[in-house]
Each structure stands twice: as C-alpha cells, then as structure tokens.
Amino acid sequence: MTSLLKSSPGRRRGGDVESGKSEHADSDSDTFYIPSKNASIERLQQWRKAALVLNASRRFRYTLDLKKEQETREMRQKIRSHAHALLAANRFMDMGRESGVEKTTGPATPAGDFGITPEQLVIMSKDHNSGALEQYGGTQGLANLLKTNPEKGISGDDDDLLKRKTIYGSNTYPRKKGKGFLRFLWDACHDLTLIILMVAAVASLALGIKTEGIKEGWYDGGSIAFAVILVIVVTAVSDYKQSLQFQNLNDEKRNIHLEVLRGGRRVEISIYDIVVGDVIPLNIGNQVPADGVLISGHSLALDESSMTGESKIVNKDANKDPFLMSGCKVADGNGSMLVTGVGVNTEWGLLMASISEDNGEETPLQVRLNGVATFIGSIGLAVAAAVLVILLTRYFTGHTKDNNGGPQFVKGKTKVGHVIDDVVKVLTVAVTIVVVAVPEGLPLAVTLTLAYSMRKMMADKALVRRLSACETMGSATTICSDKTGTLTLNQMTVVESYAGGKKTDTEQLPATITSLVVEGISQNTTGSIFVPEGGGDLEYSGSPTEKAILGWGVKLGMNFETARSQSSILHAFPFNSEKKRGGVAVKTADGEVHVHWKGASEIVLASCRSYIDEDGNVAPMTDDKASFFKNGINDMAGRTLRCVALAFRTYEAEKVPTGEELSKWVLPEDDLILLAIVGIKDPCRPGVKDSVVLCQNAGVKVRMVTGDNVQTARAIALECGILSSDADLSEPTLIEGKSFREMTDAERDKISDKISVMGRSSPNDKLLLVQSLRRQGHVVAVTGDGTNDAPALHEADIGLAMGIAGTEVAKESSDIIILDDNFASVVKVVRWGRSVYANIQKFIQFQLTVNVAALVINVVAAISSGDVPLTAVQLLWVNLIMDTLGALALATEPPTDHLMGRPPVGRKEPLITNIMWRNLLIQAIYQVSVLLTLNFRGISILGLEHEVHEHATRVKNTIIFNAFVLCQAFNEFNARKPDEKNIFKGVIKNRLFMGIIVITLVLQVIIVEFLGKFASTTKLNWKQWLICVGIGVISWPLALVGKFIPVPAAPISNKLKVLKFWGKKKNSSGEGSL
C-alpha cells in the first residue's frame, strides 16, 4: 500500500503549490494554475490577463465575476461596520445607565394576541437595550409577552405559527434575483466572433437580395444569421439552466436544520421555520439562527466575527449581556435562547439580503481548461488569418474559379457589389474557422459535469459547498476518518458496566451508587427526555453518547424531570474534546455541593483517588483496584465497546464562588470518587469494510483518527478492514494522540505516512497529522464533526463535515457535507471526484479531434483549391454539436467501478494524457485522410463524372460534410471509454447520451435532406448515405485497433514546451494514463 502511494500520480511533487513549497516560483511558471483553496484575487486576475480574450464574454461566462466579488466584500464590510458601531453605542449607553442615566421606553402596545409589537422588539434587539428588556420584565416577562414558556417553548401548532409569522415575520430574507434568461441571451450576443459573423451575414444578405432578388438572394446571408442566432439561443439556454441548478444547490447549502423546543419536546426544523418566541438550545458549534436573548447558559461564549469582523470571543451572561446576534457562532459552553427577531429584522438578515446572489467560484480545472483553450485558440487565429490571406490572394490574383471554370475576379470587369460579396464570403469562412478552432465548450463541459455531479452527489448524501472540492476529491491519496458515526452506526447502547468495585448488571447497581449516578446523568448532560402526554415511548435528544447514557439511567429507574428538580446546577464545564470530559457542579436539596464528571474512562479513572464499593462505602483506589478497572476498560475496548466513566466529589458549599466569579470557576477535577464505568456498543456500519477495501484498491489509504481509547480504535479498525489481522499493531501503525503531539515536526513527518489508527486524539492532533501528511505530498481528505475540527477541515485539501452530528462551525469550514455521516458516502464522493476529471478528459479528446480535423481539412482545401468543403453554416452546426451537445453527452457520464481501479488523479498531471493523444491523433488522421481524398478525388470515386459539375461538386461537399458529422457522432462512443476496449459498456443505461446521439443524427438528416439551400447541401441517395455511415462506423474498429498500440510512460506534454500549461513536469515514475 505504501509503495502504491509513493508512485501515485496523485502525490505532490517538490515544487507543487499545494504542498506549500516554492509557491511563488511555481505560480510564476504556470499562469493557468490556481490553488484549490483560498486563491487570491491577484492570482485570479493573473490568468485572465494571460487568456485569449477575443471572445471574453464566452470564455469567462463560467468563472468568478471578480468585480462583483469585490463589491460583495465591500457590502459585507459596511454592514459589519454598522453592527460594530451598534455594539459600541450599546456599550456607551450601558455606561450611561450605570451612571444613573436611564433610557426610557414607552409602554408596550398590543400586537395581535401578543403583548409587544415587532417594532419594539427590533429596537430592543438592535440597540441591545438592557433597559427596555428590564421594563418588559426581563427574559421571563418578555417570554410572557410573547406567550412562550422558557422551559417548554411555544405550543407549535399551525395556528400559533401562522400568527407569529404574520405579526413578526418569517426567518427568510428577500433574495436578489439572479440573471434572467434575457440577460443570458444578451451576454451570449457579446461573443466577438459571433458579432463578426452576424455583420457578415447582414452584408451578405443585403448584397444577395440586391444582386439576385429577395427570393433567391437571402439564402447565404440568412442561413448564417439563422445559424448564429441558433448558437446564441442554445448557449443562453444552457447557461440559464446551469444558473438555476447552482441556485438550487446554494439554497440547499443555506438550509440549516436545528432543534427547537416546542410543546416541551425538542423537534428538528429548518432555520427558515424559526419564529419569534421560539426557545432554542445552543451548544458548541451551533450558529445563532436569529436575534434573541439568553434565557440561561453555562460558560456560553460567542464568536461574533461574522457580524463585527472582530475575532474576539464574547462571553454571554443572562443578566449582564443577554443579547445574541443572528449569524454568530457558539464558541464555548451551552445555553438556551428566546427568539426576538427573525429575517430582515436582524442585522444578519440584512447582510444576507444584500449579498444573497451567489457569485460563483473559480475552480483549478476551469482555469487550466482556459489555458488549453487559449493555446488552441491562438493556433486557430493563426490558421484563420493564414486562410484569410491565402483566399484573398487567390481571389484577387484570379486563381479562384467560378462555376464555369473561369476566374471569379477580373480586374476592371468584376462589379464592386460582386467583389464585396465574395470578400464577405471569404471573411465568413475565416471567422467560422476561429469559431470551430477555439474550444469554448471546455468551460461549459466543466460547468456541466460539476453541476451534474453535484446534483447526483446530493442523491448520494453529499452536499458540495465548494465546487473545486469535486475536482480535488479525485486526487485524494488518503482519508483521515472519524470513527463514531462515520465508520460506525452511531446507534449507541450501554451493554456492560463496572460499579461497586466489580463487573455488574447494567440495570442493577447498589442503591447508594444508583442515586449518585442518576444525579450525575440527569444534570451532567446536554440531552433531554420527553415523555409524551398520551403515553408511548420516551423520546431522547442529544448526542448518541448522551442518549445511550440517558437510556441507561432510565433502566436504573431514573425519572429525568424528577431527578433534575432534586438539585440545581451551580456551574457547568461543557464536554471538551481536548480534555475528553465534561463536568457540572450541583447543589442538592440538603445544601450539599456535588461535582460530577463524565468522560473518557482512563482519563477520568486517573483522577479518581477512591471508589464506592458494593456496600455503598467510599474505598481507596488501590493499585490492584485501579488495575482491575483498567483491565476491564481494555477488555471492553478490545471488543469495540466505547468506555465512559462517571465520577464525582463533594465540595464545601462555602467555597463555591458567587457573582461574576462563579462564571469563571474552574471545577475541581482531582480526588474524584469513581461511580461507574460503562461500555457502550456502537456497531460498525454494514458495508464499511467493502468501502475501505475499495479505497485501498484505488490507492487511497484510509486512516482512523478518533478520540476513543486506542484499544477500541484498534478493534474497530480490524473490523472495518483499516488494519489487517497480520498488521504490525505497534507504533507508528497504531499510535496515541499524545505521543504524536509530543514529537517534533521532523519526527512526525518520518512516521505520519505509516499511521493507520490514532486513538485518544484531540482535534489539534488531527490538524498536526493533516499538516504532516500534506508536507509528505499527500492530498488529504478529512472528516470532522466538532467545532474544534474546523482547523483540520480548513487545512485539509478536502474537508468533509458530518451532516447529522456536525456542528455549524464544522460545516462552514468544510468543502463537502456528508448528509448521512456514512463512510460509504465519502467513498462515493471519491468516485464522483474522479468522474469529474475523467469526463472532462473524454470531452477534451472528442473536441480536439474535431478541432484538428476541421482545421486541417479547411486549410489544406483553401490553400490548394481556393475553396473550402465545409461552409460557414456547416461549421456552425459542427460547433453546436461539439460545444453543447457533445459536452452534455460526455460531461454527464456517471462514475464507473473502473475509475476506482486506478491510482488517484494527479491534480498537476497533464490534462491530455498519452492515451488521449494516441486516440485523438488516430481519429483525426483518419478523418483528414478520408475527407481530403473525397475533396480532391471525390467526383471520380463517387462516380459523379457525368453529372453537371456544379451539382457533382455540391454532392461531393454534402458527402464530406455528412461523413464528417457522422464521424463525430460515432467518435463520441470512442470518447466515452478512452482506455477501455468495450466502448459500448453501459451505453444503453446512459439515456441522455443515447438521446443526444439520436437527436444529432435526426437533425443531420433534416439538414441534409430538407434544408439544402440553408446549409448548402443537396439530397443524397441511399448508397451515398451508406458511404457516409460506413466512413463514420470505421472509427469504431479503428479505435479498437489503436488501443493495442502502447504509449510511452513519460507524458508527451512534458516534451512540448509550448504545452507547459497542460501540466507540470512529472517525475520519472509518472504515468501517461488518466
């Protein structure tokens, strides 16, 4: 596996920008390259300046509008400045109030059934007016005015929700309208080549009507004009459809789901369905979904940088600073809030309304393809200019013949009108060569395949937040995966327990231990239990671990509400992924203070100095007893159980801080008394082992990075196939986060490639691993769900956040959200990533074949005979097949298992591989040879010698045009499978591909048989049709024979200095395959 990764083309080389080495040198030498993440505006501007801008409106129509991006940033900054000014003003007013200057607020006026108007709420929330809140009776009084219960929320029935939305508004904001179809139509008209063709068409139309009359004279100019209009309409329709598709995907990205309290139970709703009066639980990583006031909280701290631009973390207090701004993130602690403002009645709503039009995104592949288009376009321009000069020279020197064999131009005799008409036709041919030569379909193909892939990935439970992640995922060489919920089902149940100094029945503990365990479970939790009024099963909320422990508490006889009412929380330390534990201090009914801790078993056990024995007495934690518990932990962990310990200690009530000091109190975590250790079963997901094997066969190493015990991680890794039964299970294959953390960067770099499992890791350990792997040249994908995973998700080449267990902070730092938290979905993302790249390569092979063939045929014919067999209208039709229909057919190929049998795609590898060069040259040489032979010897070969010369020439040119188009149609089948011999595999299942082929053929028949005057064709008999079909079909066996021709290992592109932007030079181990 290691050797496979070392030779993989997906690995970064020494000078790769993505590895962070020699960035400036590399970027300077490759204009058409941008980083896959966080490209600077300057870098994005640089490649545009280098691109061929003859037809900029089409070239850049699928790229980021840099001017609009700058305007968006400025608008965001203005609104942030406004929010910042409001906060400063609020602090000033707070100081004034403290000095005795009290701001008065008028009495609340009724608003429907509620006791406060929307205007009053908006003024209070936006000004952070504590005085107004006090006048309304504080948070409880405000809740009464809004007819909500701080502990149970609103009733949540349809009538209540409708009233609240009617009076206070909904949590939505007006979206700026995207570009309409007419705008896309107008943009398509700005293509300079099409404008020149349209001018030529108008001139030809006017001259034709003048010389031949309206009945016959409109054909040439009218045909070109119609063809140009058709290209414009098809381009606009395609662009408009893609715009709608991306808009729908953007809507899905913004649709956050969260829990609210309604009718006493926690229910999950869309952020758009939040109403004023809702009570919302807040936990680390959540986004504050609306403006509101804090009801209660423990160590609650917010990151308000999204609104104020300041990265400072702000502590929130229900008494002193209760106002919460929509859009901020919960950085620490937990609490619950009462919603007071939604939608445009919030600063965040105003911000989103002002920038809600998504401005697209640049992807590295789009930029590289623009580099390809620039090079080919330059050749096309040179060829077109040469053809123009040659045709004009031949015409004015009398070498261009008319239908009677005489010179078309005779100095002093040919009328000026005829000269202008002939020159316009020559110009039209030259411009049309540019239209066909410049492969504008390449950016369209990227957009099509990305849009198609993103839509299909949604069905595969993956929501793409950043387009370039689709491409980058195809290059991934390693995946650092979480265990819980990704490799396992996240359906946890307590199945074993140690308490009273021995292994016990999970449902029967000594009475003394039971009472303390129930107290700890009910208070030291962010979950809850809802008891339906009409009876029925209990409803648990919270994380899977919390649910499992709450369920265990119920089996022990716990009544959740009763247990919570018997003590009150003084202070809480929410679970911390660094410390691997969370604690709470409670005051019991008899005035005692208990500090309860819950967390990773061996970490909590290490803090215990005693335990409660089976008689309910506190006994010292001897070495023997500590070893007994440790062996129990190892035994459970070795059987894939997740081990959690519960402990407590008493604390002197008089030493408990009060006032402001209470919020800063660090709960004591030493001298603990062990209550119980439980083993929680979290089964492996079905099929995850097959997914891991699929990754390994594809050259992608899967590594498990988990906060669980090393032994639990080892057992799960063996079950999932990450570790083989005969693998070396010592360091560094199996390593603990602490050991890795204490190493130097150099030491980490030596072993990081060998790590398969990292247990008891913190989010920072994951970040260190990602950084080390990237330094080693890996393209790293990372899964994460917690707020503290954000740095690793951001640092990785592809950050994958969990959609179910993931916090909003993690999701916002990610590139792709895995909606079902399933590792199998991660593997599907890898398949789609490879499919994006493969589909683009298929289209490049197809399009370049057409480019080369059309250019050579017209150039050779123009130089030798002064005429071209493929007319302007015919070339525009070919352009339509190539740019739009071809892109649609080849860019929407679904991924195949064949893709997962290859090593990862190298992001800096040549786009045109040796296999593609071989395939396209074989087809292009064949087409050029056959069609030029027909051009020069067609009349005799086809037996047309006895026909009228003009008719014979027209039949010959029609056969050339027809055969050329059919060659492209049949060659689309070859392009589907560039390196496979069976080009028909799975073709019937791809209905879109077959539909486009049928449409192309039907339209071609119509053009040849019924639109002769429009397309300069004539009807063909069945024998002539058979010849055309035969010429096209031969491309199939020719492609098959060609696939037996070996290709060199070193990419041809490396030897061609002029093609440097098609890929960076590979090392000697690089392959010329996809």
Swiss-Prot record:
Catalytic activity, EC: 7.2.2.10
Ranges for region Disordered: 1-33
Cross-referenced InterPro entries: ATPase_P-typ_cation-transptr_C, ATPase_P-typ_cation-transptr_N, ATPase_P-typ_cyto_dom_N, ATPase_P-typ_P_site, ATPase_P-typ_TM_dom_sf, ATPase_P-typ_transduc_dom_A_sf, Ca_ATPase_N_dom, HAD-like_sf
Keyword Protein biosynthesis: no
Parts of the chain on the Extracellular side: 202-219, 390-426, 860-870, 935-949, 1012-1021
GO annotation, biological process: response to nematode
Region Interaction with calmodulin: start-end pairs: 43-54
PROSITE patterns, sorted: ATPASE_E1_E2 (PS00154)
Domain of life: Eukaryota
Domain notes: The N-terminus contains an autoinhibitory calmodulin-binding domain, which binds calmodulin in a calcium-dependent fashion.
The protein's name: Calcium-transporting ATPase 8, plasma membrane-type
This protein's encoding gene: ACA8
